[in-house]
């Protein structure tokens, strides 16, 4: 994909603008005043900047900054008069800086490394400053050589009174304008180079039946399954993406969406670069203010003041909207981009987002940015991939950032459409002349339709169709219930606060955070590792709390329940842990341990400490309050805890370990304390169940002996 310029780059000049430029030159040349549109790139103070002691050092540092994307070009007017060189604001014509000709030490055109066109170099020495300033400019309509000749001609005229060189330079300038040459149209201006655009690529097309194919963008979760990832032939005719138009058009759409994503990243990087330059300029101004002895403005402060001006509120809103838009685009293109992938680019966006939130005064401003809404896929991508630090930032931004658009009230006004700094617009129509839809808005509409289609159908008179009632009864049998083992406090609108011993209905258990519904009908996400299977509420189980309808007549008395059929419980069902036999209970405990281990590794990342591989489950020590320290140590090693955790807790007895609370374990083992507490809780539950079984067996044995005794008495 091609690299495009950023917001500071000047667009290709139109014929009218070139005409106006020529007209301005023709009117000012007679007064020995010329004016040029330039981009100011950077200013170095020799001796003050790190490693910048000569002009050559400044040129090398500029090349390094450009390769790192740290150059922020700022458009302005450079005016040359018989006595001075002045820098003006291009809009207000306000004077930013003024350099007398006797203060200009050097004027030259330099060729930075990796560029095909030269830059204008000005070295200015103010009488009040010990070291000179080095300025780099880039000509927009004329090359740096012509501007250099004009300034050097003015210097010669100022010092010797000879004006032939400047007159020749002005004639050359007019001749160049007549030819309509434009450096900006021939070569990209020196500026920030996007670091992401060069590596975002669509996935390699696969050859099917000798014909190159492009992966289409899936609209549903099922479309992302591995066996369907490369399906490129005819799709569902009702699909809002492909329909009968074929995979070739889908490939073009994917490329268009990737191009939009690249431009979004360009603008985000430009905004962050502007924030960094603004902060640097502010620090320099504050440093100069502290060391100033007079009230006279020092050299270069006009440029610094302009550069230190922070972005406006509208600009902050615009970049936050683009970040939200990028989240949805990344989720949509998850199967179409690689090197880097969507999750990797997701982490890349959180750095700028953190900086923007900090510089805008905290998360309150970002909370007010409601549009565009996030797609359901974007929320899923975020929830499944953010790190703990990123999750803290993400959840602090409120419901408009953590809830999908289908769960938020609709916003008034036209749909959001990004406007890019450099004026680029995506193609409006496809090769067949049909208008392209905005990819994020289309995905939001698709999710809304899917939500409406999945809603329960009710007749006009309020009575449900008998066939639908039968389906609901079948659905009721397949519903899944869980028991909450710990309190959990929601941190955002998408999560649900639950209490210990709450019985919850599971709505979605495909990821690490399960979507559940409580007895009040409230829905939200909770972590899966605080839940255990449960048979569900014993009263009115045939109706969900959210769907329960009161009737005017009391229900008839229930019929005698048939004898329960002994069926082996399935591990994906809602059977209670208490109803399992010891071997199955052990299997569930093992599954829970594996899930917790996976969660710990995912949260810790690749750089986390390695763990001891757990030994065979059959040889696992049985931990109880009566266990000695050696048994506790062996149990910790078997569970795969790190050596630090084993050394810290391996000196405790079973009773001491069982008495510790989660906060105390976290204080001793910050990284693994919570997991130790979870494992101890599971072990405690297993012990309690075994004791209940033993008590039940004792009662049954006593009852059996009593019955046998009564039988013997009757026989006698």
Swiss-Prot record:
GO terms for cellular component: cytoplasm; ruffle. Keywords: Coiled coil, Cytoplasm, Phosphoprotein, SH3 domain. Residues 682-713 form a coiled coil. The modification Phosphoserine is found at residue 182. GO terms for biological process: Rac protein signal transduction. PROSITE patterns: SH3 (PS50002). The keyword Cytoplasm applies. Residues 453-464 have a biased composition (Polar residues). Its main location: cytoplasm. It is found in: Cytoplasm. Residues 35-164 form the PTB domain. The modification Phosphothreonine is found at residue 187. Residues 175-194, 203-249, 404-472, 528-582, 600-628 are annotated as: Disordered. Detected in placenta, skin, mammary gland, bone marrow and stomach. Residues 477-536 form the SH3 domain. Stimulates guanine exchange activity of SOS1. May play a role in membrane ruffling and remodeling of the actin cytoskeleton. Belongs to the EPS8 family. Interacts with ABI1. Part of a complex that contains SOS1, ABI1 and EPS8L2. Associates with F-actin. This is Epidermal growth factor receptor kinase substrate 8-like protein 1. It comes from Mus musculus.
